[in-house]
Regions:
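A broad "non-catalytic interaction surface" signal
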Residues: 1-173
Length: 173
């Protein structure tokens, strides 16, 4: 299951089927909701060990997720990667989460992703959103490292839709 919780709001959940076990699950018929400028916290439910969680939003609706991370492991402006629990560039080294908190040792075994803010200038509309569980990889398609590929490490990807809407909506009959 993947979740999104607006700051002070109710948790929204999309539950993916557990069988058959696949790396990619298309749940784009399910939708989560957020407003421009709203702070939200993503989360995943995962049974397994020593993995990390990543969330992406295709803000420019170009059909691909483009992660951009600075040398200090902070998320670059304009990145489709919006939150991650751990990234270190090297499997055996310390790293950070997307809030910039340094993580080392057994603390690297975390799926807890920091909250992020939907940019205030985001136009209302439908956006593809991707949740990924993987080991130390910001690649939105999953690690292809021969020593620990997503297909072999027990990770997975769930795709959903994100409905960005204003505080009010007009309903037409």
């Amino acid at each position: 299951a993947v979740k999104l919780q607006p700051n002070g709001g109710s948790v929204q959940t999309v539950t993916a089927p557990t069988t058959p076990k696949t790396v990619y699950v298309n749940m784009t018929t399910d939708c989560l909701y957020a407003k421009p400028g709203e702070t939200v916290t993503p989360s995943v439910a995962y049974d397994g060990g020593w993995m990390h969680a990543y969330t992406y939003i295709d803000y420019n609706n170009d059909g691909k997720f483009t992660p951009k991370v600075n040398d200090n492991l902070s998320i670059e402006a304009g990145s489709d990667l919006v939150s991650f629990s751990f990234y270190g560039g090297n499997d055996n080294e310390n790293g950070k989460n997307s809030a910039g908190t340094s993580i080392s040792g057994s603390g690297r075994n975390t799926l807890v992703m920091p909250a992020f803010t939907i940019p205030a200038d985001t136009k209302p509309g439908m956006y593809r959103m991707r949740y990924k569980v993987d080991w130390n990889s910001i690649d939105p398609a999953g690690s292809i490292d021969q020593s620990n590929p997503i297909i072999g490490n027990g990770g997975g990807i769930i795709a959903v839709m994100l409905n960005i809407h204003g505080a009010y909506a007009n309903v037409n009959d």
